[in-house]
Amino acid sequence: VAERVPLERNLVASVYDPQRIKYGTLLTEDALALIERSRSVLPQDAVVLGAPSRGAAHLWSVGGVHVVYPTRDQTAPGTPGATLPSAWPTLGQKGSQTCTLLNRLGVRYFYSRSDATASGSVTGAAPLRWDSRLTQVPSEGLELVDSEGSASLWRITACD
């Protein structure tokens, strides 16, 4: 057993230590602080949209807040959740289907994290997958609710 301790320690560090992560960081300290207090700043029935590859899925697992994407896996084709990432950049534009999709999913909030270096993590943020468009923060139609460092929670006002 004693021989395995260094291996286990290195394995844990490769996943959780920001200076030794091998794959990419999903959460920074700032994002974690925001997520931990999100339940106290959002309504109880809030549903949040955001890129799971930038930590949005942790709003559900750590913060207890409903999210559109609770994992980094892509949503089943043909569902509103599968269509929403490609529609998201058109929020507020005439003829956009974004608000229709958001309304079908009950989404009123958006989570963003803009620090691609993940607070100086050696490998930076985890690579984006199908959720890359969900890292774009529209210039209109959002109202800041709370932020910590590069992590922010927004109320979506474009669909009011």
Give the positions of each predicted feature.
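Extracytoplasmic
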Residues: A2-D160
